[in-house]
A protein has these predicted regions:
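OB-fold/S1-family RNA-binding modules
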Residues: 1
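Long, compositionally biased eukaryotic signaling regions
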Residues: 4-6, 196
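Interdomain regulatory linker/hinge segments that flank or connect interaction modules
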Residues: 6-17
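Translation machinery proteins
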Residues: 17-70, 92-93
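Flexible, glycine/charged-enriched surface loops at secondary-structure junctions
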Residues: 21-26, 189-198
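Short, hydrophobic beta-strand segments that form beta-sheet elements in well-ordered domains
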Residues: 60-64, 79, 106
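Glycine-rich phosphate-binding loops that contact phosphosugars or nucleotide phosphates
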Residues: 74-77
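Long, charge-patterned amphipathic alpha-helical coiled-coil/hairpin "stalk" segments used as oligomerization
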Residues: 81-190
Length: 199
């Protein structure tokens, strides 16, 4: 398996060849899998918490009302959506798509899950973005903190994986540690572990 120092070297080489840009360029990890038949239904939809937060945290929407909704607002959720908001989205497919594409992750109060399924399930499901249920009295702050430092890795109908691991302003060792965290997680989910990753 690739080591952290090898990844650091690759990042340094990539940075050398880059032109100066006015925006923060992201750094992505590309992984090619082998000896897996995706046509036979193999799929992955993993949420992986990274050891080092990127300069732009993941966008997280919380679907909740009452105390959980208030706590989510205080904990700086990117948006808090209540019952009325979900009902409105159910009436407008275009607005629903726009809303779903805006966020990386969705968290939902368990009692709102049936309404979420009814109003947005058809759009969230195929994108692998169904909300993570948050039980009553669970610490929404720690859920938000975890998801804001996470990424989603999906494998469906393809043997290649692309995911963001950082940006050019981050220390190379931090970016490499993020890449290693993703690789280590994937190895545990693949049928033959490390052997399913093309060298």
């Amino acid at each position: 398996m690739v080591s952290e120092s090898e990844i650091v070297t690759l990042i340094q080489e990539a940075k050398k060849g880059e032109k100066e840009r006015k925006f923060k360029e992201s750094l992505e990890l590309y992984i090619t899998l082998k000896d897996i038949d995706v046509k036979k239904g193999f799929a992955l939809n993993e949420v992986i918490q990274l050891p080092n937060q990127m300069s732009k945290p993941a966008a997280v929407c919380v679907m909740a009302t009452g105390d959980m909704g208030l706590k989510a607002k205080d904990a700086k959720a990117d948006e808090v959506m209540d019952n009325d908001g979900l009902d409105k989205l159910a009436q407008d497919k275009r607005a629903s798509r726009k809303f779903i594409n805006k966020y990386d992750f969705f968290l939902a109060d368990t009692k709102l899950m049936p309404l979420v399924g009814k109003s947005l399930g058809q759009l969230l499901g195929p994108r692998g973005k169904m909300p993570t249920p948050v039980p009553f009295n669970a610490p929404i702050e720690s859920f938000l903190s975890r998801f804001k430092t996470s990424i989603r890795v999906r494998v469906k109908n393809s043997l290649s994986i692309t995911c963001k691991v950082g940006d050019v302003t981050m220390d190379e060792h931090q970016v490499a540690a993020n890449a290693i965290a993703i690789i280590n997680n994937l190895v545990t989910k693949l049928p033959n572990g490390n052997k399913n990753i093309r060298k």
